[in-house]
Amino acid sequence: MISVGVDVSKGKSTICILKPYGEMIMSPKDYEHTQSDLKKLTDQLDDFEEEIHVTMESTGNYHLPIAAYLKKKNYDVRIVNPLEMKRYRCQGLRNPKTDSIDAVMIAQYGIDFWFRPFRDYVDDNERIELKALGMQYHKTMKTRKDRCLVLESIIDRTLPGIGGILNDYDKHTGKDKKSDFVYDFYHAEKITVHSEKRFCARYASWSKKKGYRYSEDEARQLYSIAKDSIPTLPPSENTKLIVQDAVRILREVDASLYDILTRMNEIAKSLPEYTTVMEMKGVGISIGPRLIAEIGDPRRFHSAKALIAYAGIDAPPYQSGRFTGTERHMSKRGSRIMRKLGFELMDAINKHQKSYAGDPVCEYFLAKRAEGKKCRVAMFAAYNKFLRIYHSRVSSVLNESVK
């Protein structure tokens, strides 16, 4: 029984090797995440004839190189949640923290929980790439929000008031009508310099050229807002540069989002559960691939409850003495992306209640609303039910595909 504790950091790891009762075979030592350095470690481990467990924390992407290398060498690698390891480490009155101390504690953890059942699913390349694309989409969407705020602050000085008139970014087409409009009509005077009739004609021509549906009421509304607005920047070349530069950057981000989502759909279509997931109500070409990417193989969760806990929407019981908590809040200990997807999914079901009549998730949502639950409480209660159905259906499909 030999426990290898790995304290992972960027580019290197501090490694300690222990046996039961605190016998230290190797004191903490640093190894770079390179094949030559890790080969020295495996050469030393190969000399042992006892069973070896390697334990490390899940630290974003830092642990992936050493974990992949050791798994390739057929070592039993156990990746532990950092929160669980932190609670294990902080049991004393004094809690010093260094890489060496952490490596010893992780190795000791491996001995204390040696016989704990551990399930390790190895994803294929398609799922790994899909997960990476899903993370990239999430980060790029954050960038888009920042760029939208920048553009909005500029529009408030050049063409205030048009925020809710024009459509925003469309995930399905990759188009953004509002940013396209302000790129060409970057200032209120670029609209009011024409008569209303002349602007409507020009707006119709612009809509046709850009591939948007023309609406005369929309054109008149834009003209009215521009005429009544109070711009605080002049219609100069400098203002034009500021607006168009902000739009140009936003377009590049939009194009990146569209390309990522398109590629995610292409990869997801090659997976056996794609059709089953896309048939579920509320799931479209935007949510579907991202949901598949984030959950991965649902069979890695021992039950639907584990999947719900992974999403962080579980409500753990709380009881002490004669008190039993009945109104519990979500733990929010899981994936933020899963909760974001859950909100998007349930928002779609909420908006299309008539179309989804008879769907068990939609019916459950409406039942909770009828009980007087707040909208978001009902939404995540229904999302809980959705994940139970997802786990059952997709696991069944994947099991059949193996036969």
What residue spans do the PLM features occupy?
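A detector of single, family-specific signature residues
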Residues: 1-403
